[in-house]
């Protein structure tokens, strides 16, 4: 029988700071991080504060599907 993969899944975190002016950004676009989370411990969507090189500041990154 095959072994289950477990509770860890790969997720994508996207910068949610849309209010930054284009002149303050380093480059256009949206920055994303990939990470893993444990589905059993964190069933809801994750929000982490990380550095966004596009915005050139620390922003809230939200989990996307």
Swiss-Prot record:
Which biological process terms from the Gene Ontology are attached to this UniProt entry?
A: translation
Q: Where in the cell is it found?
A: Plastid, Chloroplast
- GO MF annotation, one: structural constituent of ribosome
What organism does the UniProt record list as the source?
Porphyra purpurea (Red seaweed)
**Gene Ontology cellular component terms for the protein in this record:** chloroplast; ribonucleoprotein complex; ribosome
The protein's UniProt keywords, in alphabetical order, are: Chloroplast, Plastid, Ribonucleoprotein, Ribosomal protein
**Of which family is this protein a member?**
Belongs to the bacterial ribosomal protein bL33 family.
Q: Which Gene3D superfamilies match?
A: Ribosomal protein L33
Could you tell me what this protein is called? Large ribosomal subunit protein bL33c
Keyword Cell membrane listed? The answer is: no
Organism phylogeny: Eukaryota, Rhodophyta, Bangiophyceae, Bangiales, Bangiaceae
Q: Does the keyword Plastid apply?
A: yes
């Amino acid at each position: 029988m095959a072994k289950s993969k477990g509770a860890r899944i790969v997720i994508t975190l996207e910068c949610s700071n849309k209010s930054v002016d284009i002149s303050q950004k380093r480059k256009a676009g949206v920055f994303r991080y990939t990470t893993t989370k444990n589905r059993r411990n964190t069933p809801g969507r994750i929000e982490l504060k990380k550095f966004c090189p596009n915005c050139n500041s620390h922003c809230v990154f939200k989990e996307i599907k």
